[in-house]
Amino acid sequence: MIFQDNVIKEYLKNVYFITGTPCGGKTTVSRALAEKYGFELFDVDERFDEHKKMSNPLFQPAMNTYFNSADEFFGRTVEEYKNWLLNNTREQLEFVLLDLIRLSENKKVLCDCHLTVAQALAFSEPARVVFLIKDPSNLVDEYGNRPDHQGFFQYLNSATDIEKAKQTVNITLYLSLIHI
């Protein structure tokens, strides 16, 4: 079943989106605004495990891709890594939209997420979307130094060639900005 954009926009009229690059301040800003204005906060990253449990490898292959080691994960080409990252986000989006429709039926919701400009325009009016963009020069160290991303940083540091893994992540995150 496919829903037209105008239908999704109507059902998401109580949802405001804060999106953008990693380390751009999305979580900090969305939490502060949700608290200040009494909005329900929906953090897409916090829902990933829940959505993954509901996913099906046939329909959400990127969400269900497993890597045996940091070397396998970070050893992919930048193009492979970027495509996996974008596909992962796209596959989770269906779960996110349904959650947002349910949550926003009778209240305002602020969604901390990863949308492209095209997705944002398809699902919402421009006045309800904020993009926070960070200079991509060294995202991996900033990302890894955050308390909520220590697991990722430890995984990265378990790679055989840590500097190459960091470079792959930085380039991938930079190239994924093009899709924002």
Segments (PLM) and residue ranges:
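ATP-dependent NMP and nucleoside kinases share a basic, alpha-helical "lid"
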Residues: 111-155
